[in-house]
Amino acid sequence: MNTLEKARHFIYKNARPLELATWQYHFENGSKEAVLNALGFYQNEDGGFGNGLEADFLNPNSSPMATWAATETLREIGLTDKNHPIVKGILRYLESGEHFDKKQNKWLNTIPSNNDYPHAIWWEYSEESDNISYNPTAALAAFIISYADTKSAIYEKGLKIAKEAVEWFVSSAPINDNHDVSCFIRLYNVLDGEAIITEDM
Protein backbone atom coordinates (compact mmCIF):
# COMPACT_ATOMS: atom_id res chain seq x y z
CA MET A 1 0.00 0.00 0.00
CA ASN A 2 1.60 3.28 -1.09
CA THR A 3 1.31 6.61 0.72
CA LEU A 4 -1.71 7.78 -1.25
CA GLU A 5 -3.54 4.52 -0.60
CA LYS A 6 -2.73 4.74 3.11
CA ALA A 7 -4.06 8.29 3.21
CA ARG A 8 -7.21 7.24 1.38
CA HIS A 9 -7.76 4.37 3.79
CA PHE A 10 -7.36 6.71 6.76
CA ILE A 11 -9.76 9.28 5.31
CA TYR A 12 -12.44 6.73 4.50
CA LYS A 13 -12.10 5.19 7.95
CA ASN A 14 -11.95 8.34 10.07
CA ALA A 15 -12.99 11.49 8.23
CA ARG A 16 -16.12 13.51 8.73
CA PRO A 17 -18.34 13.85 5.64
CA LEU A 18 -16.82 17.27 4.92
CA GLU A 19 -13.24 16.04 4.85
CA LEU A 20 -14.28 12.96 2.87
CA ALA A 21 -15.98 15.14 0.25
CA THR A 22 -12.91 17.39 0.14
CA TRP A 23 -10.65 14.38 -0.36
CA GLN A 24 -12.88 13.13 -3.15
CA TYR A 25 -12.83 16.58 -4.76
CA HIS A 26 -9.03 16.69 -4.83
CA PHE A 27 -8.22 13.07 -5.66
CA GLU A 28 -11.28 11.26 -7.00
CA ASN A 29 -13.03 13.73 -9.30
CA GLY A 30 -15.53 14.62 -6.61
CA SER A 31 -17.71 17.68 -7.04
CA LYS A 32 -17.65 21.10 -5.43
CA GLU A 33 -21.35 20.63 -4.76
CA ALA A 34 -20.66 17.64 -2.51
CA VAL A 35 -18.19 19.70 -0.48
CA LEU A 36 -20.62 22.60 -0.24
CA ASN A 37 -23.46 20.32 0.81
CA ALA A 38 -21.35 18.85 3.61
CA LEU A 39 -20.13 22.29 4.68
CA GLY A 40 -23.66 23.65 4.80
CA PHE A 41 -24.56 21.44 7.76
CA TYR A 42 -22.25 23.53 9.94
CA GLN A 43 -23.88 26.85 9.00
CA ASN A 44 -26.37 28.45 11.38
CA GLU A 45 -29.44 30.51 10.59
CA ASP A 46 -27.53 33.74 11.23
CA GLY A 47 -25.16 32.79 8.40
CA GLY A 48 -22.18 32.13 10.63
CA PHE A 49 -20.58 28.77 11.27
CA GLY A 50 -20.23 26.68 14.40
CA ASN A 51 -21.27 23.15 15.34
CA GLY A 52 -17.72 21.89 15.64
CA LEU A 53 -16.55 22.87 12.16
CA GLU A 54 -13.28 23.93 13.80
CA ALA A 55 -12.80 20.61 15.52
CA ASP A 56 -10.88 21.98 18.51
CA PHE A 57 -14.06 23.55 19.90
CA LEU A 58 -17.54 22.09 19.70
CA ASN A 59 -19.52 25.29 20.27
CA PRO A 60 -22.70 25.05 18.16
CA ASN A 61 -23.05 28.83 18.07
CA SER A 62 -21.65 30.91 15.25
CA SER A 63 -18.20 32.35 15.83
CA PRO A 64 -15.72 34.33 13.75
CA MET A 65 -13.16 31.53 13.99
CA ALA A 66 -15.48 28.77 12.81
CA THR A 67 -16.74 31.08 10.08
CA TRP A 68 -13.14 31.66 9.00
CA ALA A 69 -12.71 27.87 8.80
CA ALA A 70 -15.64 27.76 6.40
CA THR A 71 -14.03 30.43 4.21
CA GLU A 72 -10.90 28.29 4.03
CA THR A 73 -12.94 25.43 2.61
CA LEU A 74 -14.49 27.75 0.03
CA ARG A 75 -11.03 28.95 -0.94
CA GLU A 76 -9.74 25.39 -1.14
CA ILE A 77 -12.34 24.35 -3.70
CA GLY A 78 -12.08 27.62 -5.62
CA LEU A 79 -15.68 28.75 -5.19
CA THR A 80 -16.25 31.88 -7.27
CA ASP A 81 -20.05 32.16 -7.05
CA LYS A 82 -20.62 35.34 -5.04
CA ASN A 83 -24.34 34.59 -4.88
CA HIS A 84 -24.02 31.13 -3.37
CA PRO A 85 -26.20 30.85 -0.23
CA ILE A 86 -23.21 29.92 1.93
CA VAL A 87 -21.35 33.05 0.81
CA LYS A 88 -24.41 35.24 1.32
CA GLY A 89 -24.88 33.79 4.78
CA ILE A 90 -21.29 34.43 5.82
CA LEU A 91 -21.49 38.04 4.65
CA ARG A 92 -24.76 38.47 6.56
CA TYR A 93 -23.14 37.17 9.75
CA LEU A 94 -20.09 39.38 9.35
CA GLU A 95 -22.26 42.40 8.63
CA SER A 96 -24.39 41.80 11.73
CA GLY A 97 -21.67 43.01 14.09
CA GLU A 98 -21.97 39.89 16.22
CA HIS A 99 -18.70 39.11 18.01
CA PHE A 100 -17.12 42.26 16.56
CA ASP A 101 -15.18 44.65 18.77
CA LYS A 102 -15.94 48.15 17.49
CA LYS A 103 -13.15 49.77 19.50
CA GLN A 104 -10.45 47.62 17.94
CA ASN A 105 -12.30 47.06 14.65
CA LYS A 106 -11.66 43.33 14.82
CA TRP A 107 -13.63 40.14 15.28
CA LEU A 108 -13.09 38.11 18.44
CA ASN A 109 -11.10 34.93 17.99
CA THR A 110 -12.69 33.35 21.05
CA ILE A 111 -16.24 33.97 22.23
CA PRO A 112 -17.85 33.56 25.67
CA SER A 113 -20.04 30.59 24.76
CA ASN A 114 -16.95 28.55 23.87
CA ASN A 115 -16.61 27.90 27.58
CA ASP A 116 -19.97 26.11 27.68
CA TYR A 117 -18.84 23.32 25.36
CA PRO A 118 -15.83 21.00 25.01
CA HIS A 119 -12.85 22.91 23.66
CA ALA A 120 -9.08 22.95 23.56
CA ILE A 121 -7.55 25.22 26.17
CA TRP A 122 -6.47 27.78 23.58
CA TRP A 123 -10.14 28.39 22.69
CA GLU A 124 -11.03 29.26 26.28
CA TYR A 125 -12.65 32.69 26.53
CA SER A 126 -11.52 35.09 29.24
CA GLU A 127 -12.13 38.80 29.49
CA GLU A 128 -8.59 39.14 30.78
CA SER A 129 -6.98 37.30 27.89
CA ASP A 130 -6.09 38.77 24.53
CA ASN A 131 -8.89 37.36 22.41
CA ILE A 132 -8.68 39.99 19.69
CA SER A 133 -6.05 39.90 16.97
CA TYR A 134 -5.83 39.83 13.20
CA ASN A 135 -6.46 36.09 13.41
CA PRO A 136 -9.02 35.64 11.88
CA THR A 137 -9.88 39.30 11.16
CA ALA A 138 -7.39 39.80 8.31
CA ALA A 139 -8.62 36.67 6.54
CA LEU A 140 -12.26 37.61 7.05
CA ALA A 141 -11.55 41.03 5.54
CA ALA A 142 -10.01 39.23 2.57
CA PHE A 143 -13.16 37.15 2.19
CA ILE A 144 -15.34 40.26 2.29
CA ILE A 145 -13.27 42.03 -0.35
CA SER A 146 -13.40 38.95 -2.56
CA TYR A 147 -17.12 38.25 -2.35
CA ALA A 148 -19.10 41.30 -1.21
CA ASP A 149 -20.79 43.78 -3.52
CA THR A 150 -18.30 46.61 -3.98
CA LYS A 151 -21.07 49.13 -3.31
CA SER A 152 -22.14 47.54 -0.02
CA ALA A 153 -21.46 48.70 3.52
CA ILE A 154 -19.77 45.42 4.40
CA TYR A 155 -17.35 45.85 1.49
CA GLU A 156 -16.40 49.29 2.79
CA LYS A 157 -15.96 47.78 6.23
CA GLY A 158 -13.69 45.11 4.78
CA LEU A 159 -11.56 47.74 3.05
CA LYS A 160 -11.24 49.79 6.23
CA ILE A 161 -10.17 46.74 8.22
CA ALA A 162 -7.71 45.77 5.48
CA LYS A 163 -6.12 49.22 5.48
CA GLU A 164 -5.71 49.17 9.27
CA ALA A 165 -4.37 45.61 9.11
CA VAL A 166 -1.75 46.50 6.51
CA GLU A 167 -0.65 49.53 8.53
CA TRP A 168 -0.38 47.38 11.66
CA PHE A 169 1.56 44.69 9.81
CA VAL A 170 4.08 47.16 8.39
CA SER A 171 4.65 48.80 11.77
CA SER A 172 4.80 45.51 13.70
CA ALA A 173 6.90 43.27 11.42
CA PRO A 174 8.35 40.77 11.93
CA ILE A 175 5.23 38.93 13.08
CA ASN A 176 6.01 35.88 15.18
CA ASP A 177 2.56 34.26 15.29
CA ASN A 178 2.14 31.89 12.37
CA HIS A 179 -1.66 32.04 12.62
CA ASP A 180 -1.65 35.81 12.21
CA VAL A 181 0.78 35.49 9.31
CA SER A 182 -1.42 32.97 7.51
CA CYS A 183 -4.36 35.37 7.76
CA PHE A 184 -2.24 38.17 6.34
CA ILE A 185 -1.24 35.92 3.45
CA ARG A 186 -4.92 35.56 2.60
CA LEU A 187 -5.30 39.33 2.72
CA TYR A 188 -2.17 39.96 0.66
CA ASN A 189 -3.35 37.62 -2.07
CA VAL A 190 -6.62 39.53 -2.37
CA LEU A 191 -5.11 43.01 -2.22
CA ASP A 192 -2.31 42.15 -4.62
CA GLY A 193 -4.67 40.54 -7.08
CA GLU A 194 -7.08 43.46 -7.20
CA ALA A 195 -4.63 46.34 -6.70
CA ILE A 196 -6.86 47.66 -3.92
CA ILE A 197 -3.98 49.02 -1.87
CA THR A 198 -3.21 51.74 -4.38
CA GLU A 199 -6.64 52.23 -5.91
CA ASP A 200 -9.00 52.20 -2.95
CA MET A 201 -6.80 52.53 0.11
List the predicted regions and their residue ranges:
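Generic N-terminal targeting/processing segments that precede catalytic cores or assembly contacts
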Residues: 30-35, 39, 52-56
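Long, well-ordered core segments of solenoidal/helical folds
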Residues: 6-15, 34-48, 85-106, 151-174, ...
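Solvent-exposed loop and edge beta-strand segments that line ligand/cofactor-binding
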Residues: 1-15, 24, 53-67, 122-135, ...
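Hydrophobic, aromatic-enriched interface-forming segments
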Residues: 137-201
